[in-house]
Regions:
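Feature recognizes metal-dependent phosphohydrolase scaffolds
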Residues: 1-166
Length: 166
């Protein structure tokens, strides 16, 4: 389909998706954290992205933690069963911890950002399991053909602030 008079102004979520497709692990974790937090995993599943390794990791890593500080939003007024919420809380915690560790690495690698005060974890070295999981997630996002088509469309028809129809 041709879209001759279409342009898109990118928002934060568009940029998250683009960064995730291009393999930025911190953005992948941020995107997953938001989608877990708001019970919106069907969007991820629509792309065919395999989240089973994340779920397995979260259930194993936080088996004895109810993750009560990771409250799942009932954005759509659908009160799902408590067991599913418990799994989502664990997944949310897992991707949050991964996101913070990965962001710390970015901050340390770029002191010119002046963001040292944003380093929130002292122990931020990825474990072997976390490294495997991050690499799996990067592969799921960066090799996804459907996501590639959507990102290419956003890149071709969009920009950060220049919008012109004509």
């Amino acid at each position: 389909a041709a879209y001759h008079s279409l342009d898109i102004e990118w928002g934060n979520h568009d940029i998250l998706w683009m960064g995730a497709f291009f393999g930025n692990a911190a953005l992948i974790c941020n995107l997953l954290r938001i989608n877990c937090l708001y019970r919106n995993l069907q969007v991820i599943e629509t792309y065919g992205i395999n989240l089973r390794p994340l779920m397995s990791f979260a259930l194993e890593e936080y088996a004895d933690d109810d993750c009560e500080n990771f409250v799942i939003s009932d954005l759509y007024g659908i009160e799902s069963e408590l067991e599913r919420n418990a799994v989502l809380r664990k997944m949310t915690k897992a991707v949050t911890v991964l996101q913070l560790k990965l962001e710390n690495e970015l901050i340390r690698n770029h002191p010119e950002f002046g963001m040292d005060d944003h380093i929130l974890l002292r122990d931020d070295t990825l474990t072997e399991k976390e490294k495997w999981l991050v690499n799996h997630l990067i592969g799921e996002f960066s090799t996804n053909d459907r996501l590639r088509k959507h990102v290419n469309f956003l890149l071709k028809k969009g920009s950060m602030y220049k919008v012109f129809n004509g």
